[in-house]
Amino acid sequence: MFGWTFQDSKGPRGQDYAVARSGNVYVAGLVEIPAAADGAKLSRWLPYVSVANVDEAVSRGVDAGASVAVSARDVNLGRVAALVDPEGAVIGLARSAFGDPDETTTAPAAGRPVWTELLTDDTAAAATFYAELGGYDVNTIDRRGGQYTLLASDGKNRAGILKKPSDKIMPVWLTYFGVDDPAAAAVLAESLGGKIILPASQELRDGTMAIVTDPSGAVLVLQDWTELRGVR
């Protein structure tokens, strides 16, 4: 799908874990999770907020109304935890033992995660929560006729917050992956066992994105990475 290569490893509880690379850049980790008793699809992409101290960030999050999904723990690459925010979206927290990656390795490009976006009920409350959790600045811009909330740090936009388009959708963080052609990438995803949720069309951000699920049911957004130059 993205031309990634993988390095096999083990998770903190001995479960299978794979580290994904796009070229020479580490872009993601894949971990095996237990199946749900009711057969529900649990697979998802989980973005992580880089914090100076994971344990302190967990405490700040809980004080602000979050609950702990995964308690703070040491892993091969540092220390991590996960929270359920006050609206119900799951977010990871991490402190890498090797420091944050160089900005040049996280610039938008095909085959890499290029953006992350929270769909939630209350964008203002979510912005306040994440500003406290991760020390972000909050900015609002006009985007295609509507208001779009941005979380920024060090003068760079890191994530977006958007009101959920439907009550049928649970609050969730979406991960965007850079592609050259969203329509063709969606067809490729389907041929590899995924499903197209929303095909690329002019009605969906002028055809610059498509939404699919992978074979495990995890939702991902396929984004024309060149369109992010004005946001990131």
Question: Whereabouts are the PLM-identified features?
Answer:
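Short glycine/proline-centered loop/turn elements that form peptide/ligand docking sites
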Residues: 142-147, 202, 228-229
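Core segments of cupin and vicinal oxygen chelate
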Residues: 1-25, 63, 71-78, 118-157, ...
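Acidic/His-leaning functional-site neighborhoods
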Residues: 149-178, 183-188
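Vicinal oxygen chelate
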Residues: 21-26, 47-87, 123, 176-219
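A generic structural motif
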Residues: 33-34, 75, 97, 164, ...
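N-terminal beta-strand motif that seeds the catalytic metal site of vicinal oxygen chelate
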Residues: 44-49, 94-127, 133-139, 172-175, ...
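Conserved beta-strand in the GNAT
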Residues: 28-31, 82, 91-92, 159-162, ...
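Conserved donor-binding loop and adjoining core beta-sheet/short helix segment
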Residues: 10, 22-25, 29-39
